[in-house]
Amino acid sequence: MAEIAESKNFIHAFIEEDIAEGGRFAGQTVHTRFPPEPNGYLHIGHCKALIIDFGTAEKFGGLCNLRMDDTNPTKEDVEFVDAIKEDIRWLGFDWGDRFYFGSDYFEKDYEYAVELIKKGLAYVCELTPDQFKEYRGDLNTPAISPFRDRPIEESLDLFARMRAGEFEDNQYTLRAKIDLASGNFNMRDPVIYRIRHMHHHRQGNKWCIYPMYDFAHPIQDALEGITHSLCSLEFENHRPLYNWVVENVSVPHHPRQIEFARLGIDHTVLSKRKLRALVENGYVSGWDDPRMPTLCGLRRRGYTPKSIRNFCDRVGVAKSPNTIEYGFLEYCLREDLNETAQRVMAVLKPIKLTITNYPEGQSETFEIENNPNDPEAGTRTITFSRDLWIEADDFLAEPVPKYKRLYPQGPECRLKGAYIISCTGCVKDENGNVTEVLATYDPDSRGGDPADGRKVKGATIHWVDANNCADAEVRQYSNLFDDSDPDAAGKDFLACLNPNSLEILTGCKVETSLKDAKAPASYQFMRLGYFCPDNKDSSADHLVFNRSVSLKDSYKPNN
């Protein structure tokens, strides 16, 4: 199979310069962090950032912290904290004893804000949100704040009273004093603290003022000894503010911020707001619906950690935004499962096949290889009898051109691993529907090879012993969105939903070896695709399998 060329990682090149002799971090351990906001489940877009953060530390023999960015009190939830930790562990990464919350630093954030006020580098402002926008200025007009020259002692007093809860939400803010005429609007005296009388999931009601991300984040990085703060490209214009903060407060370290492009994938949305709308409005069954791009959804669908890590590694690290084909993600999964998944036989749309010249009441067994790509995977025993299940579309009463499966007086076909058969006819009900296919077998073709060496012109088809099988429900998934770019500006993403993204098949027939199948096992249903037991709904009493990916590969990699 063709390999995908790995993009050159410019982040690694920067770090190599930094840790080389004479570099800004020469002799230091590379230290990164992954700072998710615990207000939703991680998705494949976060996964790229996660793998860059943890993978970079891994490459350079360094450390990576896990820090929950819970500075915003309105959205955080312990449920999401636990789910994020589970997802990271599932991917094979470990933060050791370096697990933190942004809210752990609230007291230090406050102290550094007071330090800025005392240095004349921050002031309490009384502009309302509407006035703030009105006085923001434009590229040719500086911003304005009539409170910029407020005396230091007055700002210190007001800021202390803000913390004490004396004022209403938005009545006051604390702003950094930088440059009201800057061409970078992030530097036009940005708000670094605002009043929010809200319950915090960890701090309770202890705080009613909260630091802005652009202020808290660089301080948290510096206090944790982060050398390289890796973040997505939308923070590129925030880097001057990041540097300003660490240069003007008394932190022990000055990290370097490096930006990379976010991951975009066609036929999906990665906005938490839009994903939440899909869940809350019932378009999907939950955050872990196998059609969702969340890691828990991908895991439930049967994606493996190796396939996701390979996908992110091969996409590489870019400076410019790009959109990757969903087919490439499927390609990486298919590549992994082709090497590891056990081959089994399952019939999703069954019709009865009767071998009319096979002795009634007789049964025999065959040894079938579990994976032709892995001899160490061994074999398994399956049973064979007169009565079998085959796929309904493996028979046609009246064949079409080039059809090489079963039809009356058609070519001989192989039953996978068993015998060669010839179709002799069928049985129909009163409405003309085929209810049973009839065939004879060649007793001298055990294993699928005729004794006389004749060429078998028909297809090889899979089957299941009707007298020794299990029933199953099978869920076949396809793209959640018909539109390749449902996230495009001006589009109603809900109008782009694919009404046929889920097909549920009941009464499917599978080998008895699958009776005890449990997630995260993966199987190749021969000729059909790769499937896994559903990690929520499948049980010994009610088997449920999800199609992870089809056998057919629509993605064409570059050589």
PLM regions and their residue ranges:
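N-terminal catalytic cores of NTP/NDP-binding nucleotidyl/phosphoryl-transfer enzymes
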Residues: 7-16, 20-85, 199-232
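Secondary-structure transition/capping motifs at alpha-helix termini
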Residues: 21-26, 55-63, 89-96, 222, ...
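Conserved short loop/turn motifs at secondary-structure junctions
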Residues: 36-38, 67-75, 97-107, 130-131, ...
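Short, solvent-exposed loop/turn and secondary-structure capping segments
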Residues: 44, 76-79, 128, 186, ...
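Active-site cores that bind ATP or allylic diphosphates and position pyrophosphate for catalysis
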Residues: 66, 70-72, 115-275, 333, ...
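A glycine-rich helix N-cap at a beta->alpha junction
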Residues: 80-106, 112-113, 120-122
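Core subunits and conserved enzymes of cellular information-processing
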Residues: 235-239, 243-245, 306-309, 313-315, ...
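Long, charged, mostly alpha-helical binding arms that flank functional sites
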Residues: 253-332, 336
